């Protein structure tokens, strides 16, 4: 089995359905003897260019280990799911389990928002 990094972009109106989609794709990979090594939900982010007149979308990254038949079925699922705007599959040499650079930036943004919200009530008094 080979290792792959899969990134897919979901329509922003379907953001609440992302956990169900991720669960379905994880089940597809693990059900056929594969493994999910890393799963990151990057959230709603700005697109580099408009896709279908949209400027924001929901990003998800998965690092998986699977066979070619499973990968073909996964890509087929992406292609015929209208909520998935774009997808990218890259073959990697080994399993990636550490947080990606994008996930680290998401965590930094969340920490910054939390510290701002914590200091806002203190300033109001």
Curated annotation (Swiss-Prot):
It comes from the Bacteria. Binds together with bS18 to 16S ribosomal RNA. Keywords: Ribonucleoprotein, Ribosomal protein, RNA-binding, rRNA-binding. Residues 116-125 have a biased composition (Polar residues). Residues 105-115 have a biased composition (Basic and acidic residues). One of its GO terms (cellular component) is cytosolic small ribosomal subunit. The keyword Transmembrane helix does not apply. Residues 99-125 are annotated as: Disordered. This is Small ribosomal subunit protein bS6. One of its GO terms (biological process) is translation. Belongs to the bacterial ribosomal protein bS6 family. It holds the Pfam family Ribosomal_S6. Disulfide bonds: none annotated. It comes from Bordetella petrii (strain ATCC BAA-461 / DSM 12804 / CCUG 43448). One of its GO terms (molecular function) is small ribosomal subunit rRNA binding.
């Amino acid at each position: 089995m080979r290792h792959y990094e899969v990134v897919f972009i979901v329509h922003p109106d379907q953001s609440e359905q992302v956990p169900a989609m991720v669960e379905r794709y994880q089940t597809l990979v693990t059900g056929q003897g594969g493994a999910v090594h890393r799963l990151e939900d990057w959230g709603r982010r700005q697109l580099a260019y408009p896709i279908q007149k949209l400027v924001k979308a929901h990003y998800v990254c998965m690092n998986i280990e699977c066979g070619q038949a499973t990968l073909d079925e996964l890509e087929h699922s992406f292609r015929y799911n209208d909520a998935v705007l774009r997808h990218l599959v890259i073959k990697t040499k080994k399993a990636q389990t550490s947080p990606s650079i994008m996930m680290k930036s998401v965590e930094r943004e969340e920490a910054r928002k939390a510290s701002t919200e914590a200091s806002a009530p203190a300033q109001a008094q």
